[in-house]
Swiss-Prot record:
Mediates zinc uptake. May also transport other divalent cations. Zn(2+) binds at residues 139, 164, 168. This is Zinc transporter ZupT. Belongs to the ZIP transporter (TC 2.A.5) family. ZupT subfamily. The chain crosses the membrane at residues 11-31, 40-60, 80-100, 125-145, 158-178, 187-207, 217-237, 249-269. It comes from the Bacteria. It holds the Pfam family Zip. The keyword Iron applies. Fe(2+) binds at residues 136, 139, 165, 168, 197. It is found in: Cell inner membrane. The lineage of its organism: Bacteria, Pseudomonadati, Pseudomonadota, Gammaproteobacteria, Lysobacterales. GO terms for molecular function: metal ion binding; zinc ion transmembrane transporter activity. Its main location: membrane.
Length: 269
């Protein structure tokens, strides 16, 4: 079993908490501004998507393969790493099937804005909060274990997830605020959803701490890579395209990949 220094655990948990708290930033944008700039939102979503795809395929998947190679040998390690990646995709597909993540638009012409029924908005708020909270658990695991094993990978990943969490905070705060007309409730709902990330990280570490090995890290990193790539392709990039007026999606995607590439190079020096 691998021995993890306690200070590394606290650092990883703090990084995960910081990424999760970005949902609160999203709620503040709703409560203290007239309306988020859709083109800037499109760029930010695509930036996060590009960053997550790049770090998942260039670093996290490779760490899965390397961990399996240390446990079982190079050839078997590559096979297991690939299987773990595909397993991660399957896991998040199942989660997305049973608990769909609402892709709420911020357009004031949407039914949620036109609907006069307070009860309808309350249902929208509840379903949105539950769905996004459920999706935040695997993101918390991803940030925590990536930082635990390699801060040079975990920190950029946490940054990408934090950007991704800002529009999620918006998606929660909008229906809650319109349903309750209470800024505190809207802020609290977004904040609690983001706290699901460090909670998921703590639960994951508690369950796996007694069996941490090269093979365990191999499975965790492979699953994380699959989950992150699916989230980027299924949620972030389509949402960015919906809000874009021009080439913001492409520019954001390239900027996200480029920023992560440069940051990973700098972390190596």
């Amino acid at each position: 079993m691998l021995q993890i220094p306690p200070e590394n655990v606290w650092i990883a948990l703090a990084v995960t908490l910081a990424a999760g708290l970005a949902t609160a930033i999203g709620s503040l944008l709703v409560l203290f501004s007239r309306r988020p700039n859709p083109r800037l939102l499109a760029f930010g979503l695509a930036f996060a998507g590009g960053a997550m795809v790049y770090v998942s395929l260039s670093e996290i998947l490779n760490k899965s393969i390397a961990s399996f190679a240390l446990a079982y040998g190079e050839r078997t390690g590559f096979t297991y790493g690939t299987l773990a990646f595909l397993a991660g995709v399957i896991v998040i597909v199942l989660i997305d099937h049973f608990i769909p993540n609402p892709h709420d638009s911020l357009d004031k012409q949407d039914p949620a804005f036109r609907e006069n029924s307070r009860e309808y908005l309350k249902r929208v708020a509840l379903l949105t909060s539950v769905a996004i909270t459920a999706h935040n658990f695997p993101e918390g695991l991803a940030t925590f274990f990536a930082t635990l094993e390699s801060p040079s990978v975990g920190m950029p990943l946490a940054f990408a997830i934090a950007i991704h969490n800002i529009p999620e905070g918006i998606a929660i705060a909008v229906p809650v605020y319109f349903a309750t007309q209470n800024k505190f409730y809207a802020f609290s709902a977004s904040l609690l959803s983001g706290l699901a990330e460090p909670v998921g990280a703590a639960l994951g570490y508690w369950l796996l701490s007694g069996s941490l090995s090269h093979a365990t890290f191999g499975w965790v990193f492979g699953l994380i890579a699959g989950v992150m790539v699916f989230l980027a392709l299924d949620e972030l990039l389509p949402a960015a395209k919906r809000y874009a007026k021009g080439h913001e999606t492409v520019y954001g995607l390239v900027a996200g990949m480029g920023t992560l590439a440069i940051s990973l190079v700098l972390f190596k020096w």
